[in-house]
């Protein structure tokens, strides 16, 4: 069994155990459920900051304990530096293990609050199941990167970009995170090392690592919320945007949706679970180009904006793509659609204005 498969099995078992042992109860009132999800996310973010603080203080404590050695001679100074580096790697590894475990536990508690159906939980062995999507979000893994529905997420990345990506995937998460923090510490030492000891420098760097943990966990929680919300909200958005039924859409509208999703997926470099659910309904893309009229393009753009708002992505490539959609749809209409989706997510307001 490969390490990757072993990690998957551990994550699945951790999620299922947390789900069955959780004291959370399903909350029928969706506004109350949303508040509970907010609390769970906030607590997870706070715990990540505390984990970063404890890890950093442990390293600083070891550095202070070894400080007298550094003044004896060069070999002792080298030994102290090596011990601090090893302590940093071990502490960061334990810290990351705690963060992954805590994310999986939080994912299970969130699923319990929203009362994810048993039939979905029973699909956990399937790669494209709802529990797998939650687990991957909790572990910081991206969505599906293979070709699905005739769309290759990595098609526009280029040969050299693909080579770099393959190289990075071979670097283990724990090792890379430990190395990253070690590099930051070395930079910090170079910057203020002349006016402070190594131990003091590590202590002063503590807020940086706490902030990194908070930012990382906040991103993870947002991704988990997006996938949970998408599970319930996506069918409602589809029904509202296409009251005639997705099977009865015109060829031009289907083609516009496929083209739009292809652009979004290639910009993100992976297929989001919300997109997978929709593409499963749309089926394979028509290889021959289909003429799209103005009304079909407008309906497709409105729907693409809604799904993009649900995913919460906002990097440079997404913003560039969003500007193109806004240009076609208009700033006013784009803002209205986003506000309607935002209200549906956070205030559970029903869709009332026609999108047809």
Where are these predicted regions, by residue range?
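Hydrophobic alpha-helical membrane-embedded segments
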Residues: 87-112
